[in-house]
Regions:
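Solvent-exposed interaction patches of small proteins and small membrane subunits
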Residues: 20-22, 39, 63, 72, ...
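C-terminal structural segments of small proteins and small subunits
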Residues: 69-107
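Short, hinge-like loop/turn segments at secondary-structure boundaries
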Residues: 42-44, 68-71
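Short beta->alpha connector loops at strand-helix junctions that form conserved
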Residues: 28, 55, 75-77
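Acidic, metal-binding active-site segment of PIN/NYN-like and related structure-specific nucleases
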Residues: 45-63
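Short glycine-/acidic-enriched loop or helix-start segments at secondary-structure transitions
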Residues: 14-15, 61-63, 84
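N-terminal first-folded block
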Residues: 2-50
């Protein structure tokens, strides 16, 4: 699966997803840190990637209508520690096949 990991998530998630044979690019590794959401979104869609983020700006399903993109996963936790974020991302990929969702998911 092709994934773009936003800058607000630990790089460890990328490492663990790559170990599961996912094609992961990160905002940090691509030099997009600090860029506007529109730039991150455009890069993600141009590359055909699901965007994984904590940024609530991407959770608006009116702006990001299901079926019009490759997918968005917005991870929201009460306690968003590094360890908890990694655990949630791992759980998502352990329990769901998010390829082809084309929807916004707050998880």
């Amino acid at each position: 699966m092709k994934v773009k990991l936003d800058e607000n998530l630990p790089l460890r998630i990328a490492i663990e997803l790559r170990a599961r044979s996912h094609d992961v690019q990160t905002v940090r590794e691509e030099g997009l840190t600090g860029r506007a959401d529109a730039d991150i979104w455009q890069a993600s869609q141009h590359e055909g990637r699901i965007l994984i983020t904590q940024d609530l700006d991407f959770s608006d399903s009116r702006k990001f209508q299901p079926g019009t993109h490759h997918g968005i996963v917005v991870i929201r936790l009460r306690s968003p520690s590094r360890q908890n974020l990694i655990a949630r991302a791992n759980k998502l990929f352990d329990t769901e096949d998010v390829s082809g969702w084309g929807a916004v998911l707050s998880w």
